Amino acid sequence: MAAKVDLGKSPAEAPFKHWPIKGPEVSVEYRDDGCILLRSKHAVGPEPRSIAHLFVTQASTFPERPFLNQRLAGRGPWRSITYGEALRAARGIAQYLIERNLSAEDGVMVLSSNSIEHALVALGCYLSGVPVIPISPAFSLLTGDHGRLRHCFNATRPRIIFAQSGSTFAGALATLRDLDATLTFVTAQDHGPDSLVLDALIETEPTGAVASALERVGPNTVAKYLFTSGSTGMPKAVPQTHGMMTALVAGLEGLNLPESEDPSVVRRTLEWMPWSHISAGNVGFNGVIASGGTVFLDDGKPMPGLFEITMRNLREVQPVVFGSAPIAFGMLAAAMENDVELRQAFFKNMQYMAYGGATLSNDIYDRLQALAVLETGQRIPLTTMYGATETQGISMTHWVTERVGLIGLPLPGLVMKLVPNGSKLEVRVKGATVMPGYLGDPEKTAAAFDQEGFYKLGDAVRFVDDKDPTQGLVFDGRVVEDFKLDSGTWVSVGVLRPAIVAACSPNVLDAIITGQDQPFVGALLWPSAAALEQFRHSDGGPAHEALKAAIRANLAQYNATAKGSSRRIERFAILREPPSFAIGEMTDKGYVNQRLALECRASAVASLYQNPPPADVVIVQ
């Protein structure tokens, strides 16, 4: 097993670092139909008219403060743009869009990943009232037929296409050119013969038309279209109004204590998660603007060969806040257990950490806190926000807790409804952060809401303590991922997966849970890089056999205390190929799409249930 840090004493004895935020206060209404309604007792904070207005205010307040930082090509030094510079550039882009007669009925599609230029295009759209449409770069780069790119284009029909590099996105640009010959293409570098240079848009002299356009931007103005992950079909286009986004800003502001605003501390973050999704594109991006913070764009990812870049950036940035998917925290814990300098840099300024997209395992949480105590003498608050593309963030763990797996309590201004669904409680929500409906799809819109207008998220939750709702809600699995064994016993994938990862830590990075209509639960496991390295140098037999033996021992120990067939892992196999970004097994938010992974690994799944099993399948017992 890979080495762990020896603290000498339990980190649970250490205090938490002070986190100036209001604690949990919730009103609970129990209805005769079995539904439970939850509301925060905290009032919402001040709400800006739009994100565009908010950015103008912050740029006027902090004109010289760095807003965005990005490395120059070739892992060079950081280049930076201030709030004031970003506003001047965005106004130029807005003027160009106005001169081209673009309106709220049109759009600017962004094909490429996070960049300073991407942000400027988005802000220019906000100021002019033209929707921006950021899509996953994978739709352009990792699929040969560009099926999802075509789908997103046809759903929104933008008039302008932006890509960071004309050469990198040449294939996607050609596909779109064939779809619509009237499109305007804009690139920041490696320009093609028929593309405009973004600098030309930025240098457009703004007139009073920009201010007039901003006056027309309000809560009901569509700021952007985001696409769902498409785990159950083609991605759906979700309008993101300014009111949806500012309602989230106001809800979060309602939780801040007066002492939260320390002018000497600038919220400095390192961001790799994509702006084509809610977490980074709305919660993170708008949150940084609201706090007057500074973003460093991370060109690394939680993938072998790329996480080393993230570690280098963490050493330099020394962030105040760090948020990511659980997979990144697992890799980070393993790295810091063997790298003192990284640990020192990571915790030097850290005020709190945040995770989302999937459940963090208890083991990773314990290891992170052990490292924090070793470095600072304190535990660091770790929060999570729960929501969806259709809802923004709707709940948050806004208090210090020693548990993981919580989704917190509803944010101020929202109503959460818990609906009995078998033995579970299904989550639904109503409020200003929720979408008005899918673009051009009234049937899916109607199916997404119940008769009272609550959006149905498809997840299940339970109270930490039924007698004390202020302890919050625990994620209890995704209803659409749960399945039955052939005995009729339900298996909760969202609960079981992190439990298995924790039981096998640090040998396993992630897991696919199997067993629908089968006699037992199985698992396909991705080994961690640390485990592969450790067992490559192990004594005795081949490294792969030693790793299988170690994981078998982990699972045997786990099974000894697991209650019932729905919690036990009877067989497993180790996956040699990492989850694929190209086909969507691994989303660009950094979590595994269980449904798609099961389809893509169908032969491996089937092998778990062969009798006798093949050599690569391990029986735990």
Please provide the spans of the model-predicted regions.
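Conserved ATP-binding/catalytic segment of the ANL
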Residues: 425-485, 617-619
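Conserved pre-ATP/AMP-binding loop-to-beta segment of ANL
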Residues: 63-66, 185-188, 192-193, 200-227, ...
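Conserved AMP-binding/adenylation subdomain of ANL enzymes
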Residues: 246-268, 275-341
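Conserved AMP-binding/adenylate-forming core of the ANL superfamily
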Residues: 43, 64, 68-120, 140-150, ...
